[in-house]
Amino acid sequence: MRLVGNDPNLQGGIRVKFFLDTADLAEIEEAASWGALAGVTTNPSLYAKIGGKLDDFHNHMKRICDIVGPDCPVSAESVAMTRDEIVADGRKLAEIAPNIVVKVPTMVEGLAATHTLAAEGIPVNMT
């Protein structure tokens, strides 16, 4: 999508990517139907807000991936707190679908886990 405004500083236009921050499947389906969805970000807290249980979070991520398709990244957050737990959870999340991006908390343990996951070729982002 290309947006151009009247501001002279935006003469070349700006690139905008629309990432939806939700765990609600109906919201994701609607946004995907617009044709402008660049990705989905979610976490267990958002999943809990729609009545989801932590032990079903990985299955729910699979359902999201099925809705958006393989070319749309889905950031799924690990709730683990130690490096080893984050790495283990990140590996499990990455096995769900090729478009999963493991979202890791920005903390010392998360930084160490990110290094390991990225070295294994697992897409990672930090929040």
What are these regions (language model features)?
Residues 16-20, 24-28, 34-36, 44-123:
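Active-site beta->alpha loop and helix N-cap motifs at the rims of alpha/beta catalytic domains
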Residues 2-15:
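Short, Lys/Arg-enriched N-terminal segments with co-localized hydrophobic residues
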Residues 41, 125-127:
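Short hydrophobic alpha-helical runs that function as membrane-insertion/retention elements
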